[in-house]
């Protein structure tokens, strides 16, 4: 049976999460969907036993494989590597740390039957970020989301849990996509030739963002700087270099707003 669905998981030192992610993903699918699905880990040469872990799961009958990169690093380029090598026409990206529930993946694929691009959103009624998420992470996430608002109508453009129909990626010049940015979903939302009709362009699937169970968070000051640089490039791409002043003004207003909110949180 031909592959119709591909799940891409960028990974670095995530050996302990590979087995639970794989088993939960396929257990959450109907038998029919599972037969048409492949799982691809894109690993940046972790050398932590991830390759052996994936091979063991493949020998157990799971349709899973691993791509090991030795000359490249970075989340966005890893996602793109997996997308371009995927066999399916419906693609989903998710984190390896189980903060994106594998059981929700079938809902993203179902949404992709009706939409060009689908996002898992943490900002729908009744769901959201786990209550144990630190306040500073919530503030950073909300601020980043607000700064991306002029670029897309999506409620959660910062989500790393998303999917797309591969044909839209194939219709975009790879040179136009910044593979060094941190938020690849936002990059693709801004640059792919998605339908003009928002009803078919973007779908959203609510999910609750969980707490990492194994490994360490990749969030750092360097990542935040990369995101700000990516935002600048996307603003220029969408609005033109002459309107860069709008980006700077928006940044400044948002900066003072966040400082105000943090002041009241602390004092």
Curated annotation (Swiss-Prot):
> Which Gene3D superfamilies does the entry mention?
Spore Coat Polysaccharide Biosynthesis Protein SpsA, Chain A
Membrane topology recorded in Swiss-Prot or TrEMBL: Single-pass type IV membrane protein
Q: What is this protein called?
A: Dolichol-phosphate mannosyltransferase
Amino-acid biosynthesis is among the record's keywords = no
Q: What turns on this gene? A: Repressed by aspirin.
**Which PANTHER family does the record cross-reference, listed alphabetically?**
DOLICHOL-PHOSPHATE MANNOSYLTRANSFERASE SUBUNIT 1 (PTHR43398:SF1)
The free-text note explaining how the cofactor binds reads: Binds 1 divalent metal cation.
Enzyme class, top EC level, equals: transferase
Give residue ranges on the Lumenal side. 260-267
Query: What is stated about the way this protein's activity is regulated?
Result: Inhibited by acetylsalicylic acid (aspirin).
N-acetylserine modifications at: 2
Q: Which residues bind Mg(2+)?
A: 97, 99
Q: Which residues bind GDP-alpha-D-mannose?
A: 10, 12, 14, 42, 44, 95-97, 99, 122, 183, 212, 218
Catalytic activity reads: a di-trans,poly-cis-dolichyl phosphate + GDP-alpha-D-mannose = a di-trans,poly-cis-dolichyl beta-D-mannosyl phosphate + GDP
Q: What gene is this protein a product of?
A: DPM1
Q: Which family does it belong to?
A: Belongs to the glycosyltransferase 2 family.
Pathway-wise, it operates in: Protein modification; protein glycosylation
* Residues recorded with modification Phosphoserine: 141
Q: Where in the cell is it found?
A: Endoplasmic reticulum membrane
Instruction: Describe its partners and assembly state.
Output: Interacts with the C-terminus of SAC1, thereby sequestering it to the endoplasmic reticulum in exponentially growing cells. Under nutrient limitation conditions, this interaction is rapidly abolished.
Q: What is its EC number?
A: 2.4.1.83
Q: What is the lineage of its organism?
A: Eukaryota, Fungi, Dikarya, Ascomycota, Saccharomycotina
């Amino acid at each position: 049976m031909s592959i119709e669905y591909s799940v891409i998981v960028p990974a670095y030192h995530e050996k302990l999460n590979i087995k639970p992610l794989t088993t939960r993903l396929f257990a959450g699918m109907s038998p029919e969907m599972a037969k048409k699905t492949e799982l691809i880990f894109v690993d940046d040469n972790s050398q932590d036993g991830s390759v052996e872990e994936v091979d063991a799961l493949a020998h157990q009958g799971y349709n899973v494989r691993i791509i090991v990169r030795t000359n490249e690093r970075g989340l966005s380029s890893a996602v793109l590597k997996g997308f371009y090598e995927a066999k399916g026409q419906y693609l989903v990206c998710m984190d390896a740390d189980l903060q994106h529930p594998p059981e929700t993946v079938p809902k993203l694929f179902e949404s992709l039957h009706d939409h060009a691009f689908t996002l898992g959103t943490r900002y729908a009624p009744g769901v959201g970020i786990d209550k144990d998420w630190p306040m500073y992470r919530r503030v950073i996430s909300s601020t980043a989301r607000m700064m991306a608002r002029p670029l897309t109508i999506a409620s959660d453009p910062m989500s790393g849990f998303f999917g797309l129909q591969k044909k839209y990626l194939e219709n975009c010049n790879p040179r136009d996509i910044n593979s060094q940015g941190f938020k690849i979903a936002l990059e693709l939302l801004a640059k792919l030739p998605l339908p003009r009709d928002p009803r078919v362009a973007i779908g959203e699937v609510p999910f609750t963002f969980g707490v990492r169970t194994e490994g360490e968070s990749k969030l750092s000051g360097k990542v935040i700087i990369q995101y700000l640089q990516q935002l600048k490039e996307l603003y220029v791409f969408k609005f033109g270099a002459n309107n860069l002043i709008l980006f700077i003004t928006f940044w400044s207003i948002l900066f003072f707003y966040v400082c105000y909110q943090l002041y009241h949180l602390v004092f």
